Amino acid sequence: QISKAHQNPAFYMDVLKNKCKYQNIIVDTYWNPGSDNGRPELFTPSFRLDLFFLGYKKGLRNHDGVSLEERFGEFPDNLPDYVEWVKTWIIRKKNAGCVALKIALAYERDLHFEQVTQEQAERVFRVKESDITQEDIRYFQNYLFWKICEIAAELSLPLQCHTGMGQITNTNILQLNNVIKSNPETKFVLLHCGFPWLDDLFPMVDGYQNVYPDLTWVPLLSYTASNRVLHQLIEMSQIDKICWGCDTWTVEESYGSLLAFRFSLCKVLTEKIEDGYLSVSNAKDIIDKILFDNAEKLYL
């Protein structure tokens, strides 16, 4: 039955549009960053920038086997021009329809991006390739991350940051504190709410107006964690910021992810109504905001 369904070219869009009732999907085509999957009527791209963090050396490939040169062409070999080149690509992708930037470096490194000087960051371009150290690479990547935060603010593009799961060491949300604090005009979307280190999320959303908690993937990872985050964010009056996404590959997974989140959200709201914390009208308003209004306001 599954095989038969997949033979129908209309199956995928039917599930997404008619079963999931999606009106717009923010898509991350990391194998071809910034693409709308050829379906602009439903998919709106986020532009993943991870490849640009490989620009300290020619010929590098990421863990998916994709190279910076193959996707974006030859790049400058000095820091000021390189940063400007990255900005040019971001502007180009925004003009082509991208509504957000995304960084998922937590799969490759920690999320503590110290602020470094241009002199420290450009050393990676000055030394022989054989002499490049891990410290040189880190300085370059840290510098670029801060510049991207500035560009995101300048171009009014939310910056989605994968947090939590990945290479695990120091990928919790608090590692981003210095960057978020120093870039108040940049909208930071904290994907996955830092799971499993959820407690980091709450002081950040309470302390910074430019932080947006996104429960993408969380209900699939842990129904209990999803419930807990929703309970606490509602009690902290963060209702206007909460977003959700499926973070899946297949339409079956997307539908299942939606069911999981609906179940979690309804469970939490039912408990809040029974406790007298919310009215039914309040709960309906929260549903509209989390499943539609907040994302529309943030991205579109």
Predicted regions and their residues:
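Short hydrophobic/aromatic-enriched beta-strand-loop microsegments
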Residues: 45, 211-216
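A generic structural motif
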Residues: 215-219, 244-246, 278-285
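Active-site beta-loop-alpha junctions enriched in small/polar residues
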Residues: 30, 48-54, 104-108, 164-166, ...
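Mid-domain alpha/beta scaffold segments of enzyme catalytic cores
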Residues: 1-143, 151
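Mid-to-C-terminal alpha-helical segments outside catalytic/metal-binding sites
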Residues: 3, 239-240, 255-300
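Family-specific functional microsites
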Residues: 252
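Histidine/acidic residue-rich metal-binding segments in metalloenzymes
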Residues: 78-103, 110-211, 225-243, 260-261, ...
